[in-house]
Amino acid sequence: MKKLENYEQILNKIKEEEYFLLYVSMNNCSVCLVDMPKVEKIVSEQNFPAYYIKASEIPEAVGQLSLFSVPVVILFYEGREIHRQAKIIDFDELNYRIEQISENK
């Protein structure tokens, strides 16, 4: 997963990419550290574009994307958020949603 450094980069991905996953974490989040490799494995197996941000580094994204807890996984498709999971990530559900998007491309 590639790191996005600011809110403008997030907006550009939403506008430019047909679909992608955004993973949101924070530095002091132990669950985030455990979940990130699992998410990376799913997106790499599906060849699905994915990016991550540290919520504490992009406060504008926290407000604009309603990021009230971490970790958060958001799937964007055709410029819209179509799926979100926060705190407890259901990896089977995430994999299923990514497969659905991949089949529709």
Locate the predicted segments by residue.
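N-terminal leader/targeting and pre-domain segments
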Residues: 1-19, 97, 103-105
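Thiol-based oxidoreductase modules, predominantly thioredoxin-like and allied folds used
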Residues: 4, 24, 43, 47-61
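Acidic phosphotransfer microenvironment of two-component signaling modules
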Residues: 8-11, 59-60, 92
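Local sequence-structure signature of Cys/Sec-based thiol-disulfide redox active-site neighborhoods
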Residues: 9-41
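Short amphipathic alpha-helix with an adjacent loop that forms part of the alpha/beta core around
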Residues: 12-13, 63-65
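Structural micro-motif
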Residues: 65-74
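Non-catalytic, surface beta->alpha helical segment in thiol-disulfide oxidoreductase systems
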Residues: 77-105
